[in-house]
From Swiss-Prot:
Compartments (UniProt record): Cytoplasm; Preautophagosomal structure
Function field: May play a regulatory role in autophagic activity.
Family affiliation: Belongs to the PHAF1 family.
Organism, scientific name: Drosophila melanogaster (Fruit fly)
A GO cellular component annotation in the UniProt record: phagophore assembly site
Listed InterPro entries: PHAF1, PHAF1/BROMI
Pfam families given in the database record: PHAF1
Superkingdom of the source species: Eukaryota
Key words of the record: Cytoplasm
GO biological process, alphabetically ordered: Golgi to plasma membrane protein transport
Name of the protein: PHAF1 protein CG7083
Length: 438
C-alpha cells in the first residue's frame, strides 16, 4: 500500500518521488517505471480519434490513484484518489486516511480546518467539500435532511454514522471545475532545457534554412534561488556538431544511423554511394527535436520535429515540439459553393503547427499523391501495435501522418549544397530525399 503525503495545489508523493501538478506526462511515466514492483497494473487511456479533445489519463487501479493530463500541453492538471482504501494519505505528516484512520467528515475538518459550506450534487448523490486546490467527495443518501447550510458537520444522518470520503481531487486553483494547467514547475526542470516554440526559417524561394528556438531552463537569481531563464537559439543547415552542442548543450542521446530502410526508393546511383561511416543523430527529447549530421561532412543536414501524439510508435519518447511555419498555398481556398475565395494573383499561405491536421494541409498544397507507408517495430519480426503511418513529401519537407490525420512528425531537409565537400551535393537532390524517412 502506497504511503503518500499531499500538498494542496502542489503534489502527491513520498520521500522517494512525487507527482507534481504541471509535470510532463513523460516525467510521470519515468516515476512509475522507477517503482516497478511497487506500482503495478498501470493503464494509459487516451482517444485515438480526438487526441486533443480528451484528457490523457494514467490509471493506477491497484493503488486507487488517477493522473489526469491536459491533452494539449500534456502536463498534469488533476490528481484523483478514487479508492481511499488502497492508499495511506498524510497532510503535514499526520494521517487523515489509513486503515486505522477513516476519512470521515470530522476527520477531514480536523485535519484541514474550516472551509466554505459543501455543495450537494443530487444527481450523483455526492457532497463535495472544497479547500483551495483540494476537494473531498462524500456519498450522501438522497433522503438526508437538507439542513446543510452551515457545512457538512450540520447534516443530520439517519443512521447516526458519518460518511467517509469516496474520492479526493488535487488541482491548482480554487475551483475544481475551472482548474488551470500549471506551467512546468521548477522542481521538474532537472537541469534540462525545454522548448517554448520553434519557428521554421524559410527563404523567399521556399527553401528551409533552419530553426529559431525559444527555450527555457533553470537559472539562478541574485539570491541564487532557482528561476526560469529564457533565451533564443538558431540552428541552421550546415552547422557542425560543435555548433549545435554549443547552442543546445549535450543531447539526451546520440544515435548512429546504421541503416536507411527507405534507401530502396532512392536512385541506383545514390544506393551505390554507401559510406563506411554512419550518419549521427542528436536526440533532444525535451525539445521534441532530432538533428541529423552527415557522416562525411559532420554538418547538419536534417531536422525532425516530433508532435508526441498518443497512439504513435514514439509516444512518450519526446516532448511535443511547438513548431510553426508558413507555406504558400498551391490551391486557392474554395467556398462551400465551389467558387474561389481569392483571386489567382493574390498569395495565400497555410499556417502549419503541431496541431494542424493533414486534411487542411493537403487541401491547400500540391503534395505527393501516393504516400510512403512507414512500418515501425522495436526489433525484427515484431509487430507495431499502433499501426502504420503515411509519409507525404512537399518541397524540402516530409509530413508523417497518423491514421487520424494528425501530424506525427515533420522532417526538414537541406536542399542547398553543403558547405563541404561540394561534390556530395548530388546525394541530396530533392527528387531522392523527398521519399527518405528517418
Amino acid at each position: 500500500m502506497l504511503d503518500l503525503e499531499i500538498v494542496p495545489e502542489i503534489s502527491l508523493g513520498c520521500d522517494a518521488w512525487e507527482f507534481v501538478l504541471g509535470m510532463h506526462f513523460s516525467q510521470a511515466i519515468a516515476i512509475i517505471q522507477s517503482q516497478v514492483g511497487i506500482i503495478k497494473g498501470v493503464q494509459v487511456l487516451y482517444s485515438d480519434t480526438t487526441p486533443l479533445g480528451v484528457d490523457i489519463i494514467i490509471n493506477l487501479p491497484q493503488d486507487g490513484v488517477r493522473l489526469i493530463f491536459d491533452p494539449v500541453s500534456q502536463r498534469l492538471k488533476t490528481i484523483e484518489v478514487f479508492n481511499m482504501k488502497l492508499v495511506k494519505l498524510r497532510y503535514f505528516g499526520v494521517y487523515f486516511n489509513s486503515p486505522e484512520v477513516l476519512p470521515s467528515i470530522e476527520q477531514i475538518e480536523h485535519s484541514f480546518g474550516a472551509t466554505h459550506p459543501g455543495v450537494y450534487d443530487a444527481a450523483k448523490q455526492l457532497f463535495a467539500l472544497h479547500f483551495r486546490g483540494l476537494s473531498f467527495y462524500f456519498p450522501v443518501d438522497s433522503k438526508l435532511h437538507s439542513g446543510y447550510a452551515h457545512g457538512l458537520s450540520s447534516l443530520v444522518f439517519l443512521n447516526g454514522a458519518s460518511p467517509v470520503v469516496s474520492k479526493m481531487s488535487l488541482y491548482a486553483g480554487s475551483n475544481v471545475l475551472e482548474n488551470r494547467v500549471p506551467s512546468l514547475p521548477l522542481s521538474c526542470y532537472h537541469r534540462q532545457m525545454y522548448l517554448e516554440s520553434a519557428t521554421v526559417l524559410r527563404t523567399a524561394f521556399g527553401h528551409t534554412k533552419g530553426l529559431k528556438l525559444k527555450l527555457f531552463t533553470e537559472g539562478s537569481g541574485r539570491a541564487l534561488e532557482p528561476r526560469r531563464q529564457c533565451f533564443t537559439r538558431e540552428l541552421l543547415f550546415g552547422d557542425s556538431c560543435e555548433d549545435v552542442a554549443t547552442s543546445l548543450g549535450a543531447p539526451n542521446r546520440i544515435f548512429f544511423k546504421s541503416e536507411d530502410k527507405m534507401k530502396i526508393h532512392s536512385s541506383s546511383v545514390n544506393r551505390q554511394a554507401q559510406s563506411k561511416r554512419s550518419d549521427i543523430f542528436f536526440n533532444y527529447f525535451t525539445l521534441g527535436i532530432d538533428v541529423l549530421f552527415d557522416a562525411r561532412t559532420q554538418t547538419c543536414k536534417k531536422f525532425i520535429l516530433h508532435t508526441n501524439y498518443p497512439g504513435h510508435f514514439n509516444f512518450n519518447m519526446y516532448h511535443r515540439c511547438e513548431f510553426q511555419f508558413l507555406l504558400q498555398a498551391d490551391h486557392p481556398s474554395m467556398s462551400d459553393s465551389g467558387h474561389d475565395l481569392v483571386t489567382p494573383t493574390k498569395q495565400e499561405h497555410v499556417n502549419i503547427t503541431a496541431y494542424t491536421k493533414w486534411d487542411a494541409i493537403s487541401s491547400a498544397l500540391a503534395t505527393s499523391e501516393r504516400p510512403v507507408v512507414l512500418h515501425r517495430a522495436s526489433s525484427t519480426n515484431t509487430a507495431n501495435p499502433f499501426g502504420s503511418t503515411f509519409c507525404y513529401g512537399y518541397q524540402d519537407l516530409i509530413f508523417e501522418v497518423m491514421p487520424n490525420s494528425h501530424i506525427a512528425s515533420v522532417t526538414l531537409y537541406n536542399t542547398a549544397p553543403p558547405r563541404q565537400p561540394a561534390h556530395s551535393w548530388q546525394q541530396h537532390k530533392m527528387q531522392d530525399i523527398r521519399l527518405t524517412v528517418a
